[in-house]
């Protein structure tokens, strides 16, 4: 599903998504950098998800041989569970937050609270976290070439400990790939897990409000093509009045 001339949504389940791949996949974005294609987040990777993502890319008239990168925002399974499958299928270079890299490489199910998530019904009980190699460890403030475009890395903890958002300086606009740091309507996700932190969330909202961008591309729910920063400002006004942003779920 084409969003702009350089960004597509090629996956995502029906729960706060477009039904382009299996539940509970997050939005899976594809960036046409002008010199290669990049995927942002991998979904859970179960069922027919990988095949459906592949078919969606082909349906847009894109060449699978141009796929070069997989960018991961954080280590929750609906974003990273399918990373190893995508990496192996398309020989992708994987970029991930430095603080999440070892968890992803080893398939450590502790920090992502996978046992709790499975027992609560978020993921199948028989799901296991397949280790995935990480080629580039991303740190706050990194500015990297992504094909013909520039990508800026922003640490945005709060939803979980090792969470990053990516500011893409595109040809037509600037895009914030926010993962689960912020959603349309200024919403966040509050969860009873060890690293979901109120003060970190507030700090990340205030931090994101210092950046200029047009499009808000979150991990779930509505994608905002223009006026995306306004949704961060909604959350910022809430915390400035000593309140907390509403939860997406």
Where is each model-derived feature located?
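Active-site HxH/HxHxD metal-binding segment of metal-dependent hydrolases
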Residues: 45-50, 55-143, 234-242
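Metallo-beta-lactamase
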Residues: 44-46, 129, 135, 143-247
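Short, flexible loop segments at the rims of nucleotide/cofactor-binding pockets, characterized by
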Residues: 14-20, 70-73, 153-156, 192-196
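Conserved beta-strand hairpin/beta-sheet module of binuclear metal-dependent hydrolase folds
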Residues: 2-60, 165-179
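Short, surface-exposed connector motifs at secondary-structure boundaries
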Residues: 34-38, 63-67, 147
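Residue-level marker for buried hydrophobic side chains located in beta-strands
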Residues: 38-40, 71, 94, 175-177, ...
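Short Pro/Gly-enriched beta-strand edge/turn motifs at strand-loop
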Residues: 6-16, 122-126, 147-151
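Short, structured coil segments at secondary-structure junctions
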Residues: 3, 89-90, 212
């Amino acid at each position: 599903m084409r969003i702009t001339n350089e960004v597509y949504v090629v996956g995502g389940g029906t729960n706060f998504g477009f039904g382009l791949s299996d539940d509970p996949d997050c939005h899976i974005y594809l960036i046409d950098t002008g010199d290669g294609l990049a995927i942002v987040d991998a979904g859970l990777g179960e069922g027919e998800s990988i095949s459906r993502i592949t078919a969606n890319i082909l349906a847009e008239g894109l060449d699978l041989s141009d796929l070069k990168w997989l960018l991961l925002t954080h280590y929750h399974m609906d974003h990273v569970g399918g990373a190893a499958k995508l990496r192996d299928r398309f020989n992708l270079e994987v970029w991930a937050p430095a603080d999440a890299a070892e968890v992803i490489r080893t398939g450590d199910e502790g920090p992502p609270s996978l046992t709790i998530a499975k027992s609560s019904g978020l993921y199948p009980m028989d799901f296991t976290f397949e280790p995935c190699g990480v080629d580039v460890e991303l740190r706050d403030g990194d500015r990297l070439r992504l094909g013909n475009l520039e990508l800026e890395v922003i640490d945005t903890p709060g939803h979980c400990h090792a969470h990053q958002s990516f500011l893409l300086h595109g040809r037509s606009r600037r895009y914030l790939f926010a993962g689960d740091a912020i959603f349309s309507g200024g919403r966040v996700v509050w969860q009873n897990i060890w690293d979901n932190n109120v003060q970190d969330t507030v700090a990340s909202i205030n931090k994101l409000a210092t950046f200029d961008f047009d499009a808000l591309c979150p991990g779930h729910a509505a994608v905002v093509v223009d006026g995306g920063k306004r949704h961060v400002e909604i959350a910022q006004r809430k915390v400035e009045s000593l309140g907390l942003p509403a939860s997406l779920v």
